[in-house]
A protein has these predicted regions:
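Gly/Pro/Ser/Thr-rich low-complexity, intrinsically disordered segments predominantly at protein N-termini
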Residues: 1-144
Length: 144
């Protein structure tokens, strides 16, 4: 499937899908606990982001990791202008994934490697859904 076909497919789909190099992966529904954690993170980051230039988005905002890779993180922070009609965040500075039993390995492996390729990304946070633990992956000012 091409990227263009993926975007057309997503327009009419009742569920969200992530796109990785031509493959489409359905996003399963989360638990109440997962959603509660993601909402708490979103609210806290929104309070910190205001009144500055940053926008904080829920898992409904797709992130372009590369031209052939699109994910729906649980929370995304973008500090560059975003048009109201945008359906993709291209310059995130913070991405948050809340793990689930089916995604923990991917969040810590494939997605960690992919998110590291985003030049604007300063932090990738992985929130463990089972216990009070946040893994922080930072990039310093020099981009390291």
């Amino acid at each position: 499937m091409t990227v263009e076909e993926y975007f057309r497919f997503e327009e009419s789909s009742p569920i969200k899908h992530e796109y990785v190099a031509g493959e489409v992966y359905a996003m399963s529904g989360g638990t109440v606990r997962h959603d509660r954690i993601a909402t708490n993170v979103l609210v806290r980051l929104s309070l910190v982001a205001r009144p500055g230039p940053c926008d904080v988005f829920s898992s409904n905002m797709r992130v372009e990791v590369a031209r052939d890779r699109y994910y729906y993180p649980d929370v995304t922070v973008v500090c560059t202008p975003v048009a109201e009609s945008d359906i993709v965040a291209r310059n995130p500075c913070v991405v948050v994934e809340v793990t689930s039993p089916s995604t923990a390995r991917i969040d810590r492996g494939e997605k960690l490697d992919a998110y590291r390729q985003i030049a604007t990304l300063r932090a990738y946070l992985i929130v463990d859904h089972r216990r009070r633990r946040v893994e922080r992956h930072w990039r310093d000012v020099a981009g390291e």
